Amino acid sequence: MIGPILLALAPVALLVALGHGLRRTGFIGDAFWPHAERLCYYVLLPALFADGLANARLQALPVLPLAAALVGSTVFVSMLLLLVRRFVAVDGAGFTSVFQGAVRFNNYVGTALAAGLFGAHGIALAAVCVAAIVPTVNLMCVLVFARYGDTRLGAWALVRQILSNPLVVGCALGIAMQVAGIAFPAAVEPAVRALGAASMPLGLLCVGAALKFDSAREWMQPTCIASAFKFMAMPLATLAAGRLFGLGDAALTIALLFQALPTSSSSYIMARQLGGDAPLMAGITAFQTIAAALAMPAVLTALASTPVFR
């Protein structure tokens, strides 16, 4: 199991490194990257999930057990983090960044790894993960921003933030098409599939371009706390929930990978918009993206000795 994970992680790491190099050298100007990330987030990745779920055999996927394990572990770790809030030496805005670093995940890295490990089946499982976790994480993060951030949100803004998420919309469209037994028109499906295929390389390049290592050194204590929850507490909670709900090897592997992913670069944007600590968020994102290259294989290696993987 670990060998295939490392093989799947290698091209992901190379694309992230290439994106960072392209930005640092100025080969591609800074003005390009926000537009590229917006394209990935609002068009390419939703197309990938809509196409994957519309063509997946949902009856062959453990949709409800997988969703229950992911939502349960996410809520559990969120509550645990709130309980230790008093021991985290940051202000309220800083705590929102620690919270995001512990529970949010990078869709591009997760989807690329799932595709590398299990092909089309992995993309379908990844789409189920996104459909389950994205609304849960957005709800938890927005509630934490409302409580600890510098900007207050109303109830309608909270609902709109969740329902308008393009990844949720893409997953909902794919599931609706699957349930209704309809498909994209023959002239449209190749275009949708091509858009989805473009999401992974461009998204990973954007991840690398967004890395800022200077800020990671300034906030080591909160960065380490967020990363400990991300790479240790979250996978352990997911393993326990996965075993409780009887997930098979492939579904549990994808669940663990998604819950051990580094936090997303969109966390920085959310921190700026909702009154969080944006510099701290940038540091956590940079640290976790690099640490994930070691942490994710280590997590799977440690868990590979459990009976679930035998």
Tell where the protein language model's regions lie, with residue ranges.
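Alpha-helical transmembrane segments of multi-pass small-molecule/ion transporters
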Residues: M1-R310
